[in-house]
């Protein structure tokens, strides 16, 4: 059986934690930040963890993990 390929979009956008959760960057931080308040900018500063339902899908798209 041939090797499975990892989706290239997953390689660029996600990282796996040590416990197997999936991290992603938060959207809405590229431009036009002057129109958002300080709370929005502060809360979107860090990465976020993907929900458990999407977690299964992303792991299927990266069958051998992300190194």
UniProtKB/Swiss-Prot annotation:
Gene Ontology biological process: translation
Name this polypeptide is given: Large ribosomal subunit protein bL35
Protein origin, superkingdom: Bacteria
A GO molecular-function annotation: structural constituent of ribosome
Record family assignment: Belongs to the bacterial ribosomal protein bL35 family.
Keywords: Ribonucleoprotein, Ribosomal protein
Gene3D superfamilies referenced in this protein's UniProt entry, alphabetically: 4.10.410.60
GO cellular component: a single term: ribosome
InterPro entries the UniProt entry points to: Ribosomal_bL35 (IPR001706), Ribosomal_bL35-like (IPR021137), Ribosomal_bL35_CS (IPR018265), Ribosomal_bL35_sf (IPR037229)
């Amino acid at each position: 059986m041939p090797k499975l390929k990892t989706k290239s979009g997953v390689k660029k956008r996600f990282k796996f934690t040590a416990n197997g959760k999936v991290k992603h960057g938060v959207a809405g931080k590229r431009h036009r930040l002057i129109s958002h308040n300080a709370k929005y900018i502060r809360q979107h500063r860090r990465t976020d963890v993907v929900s458990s339902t999407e977690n299964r899908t992303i792991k299927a798209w990266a069958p051998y993990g992300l190194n």
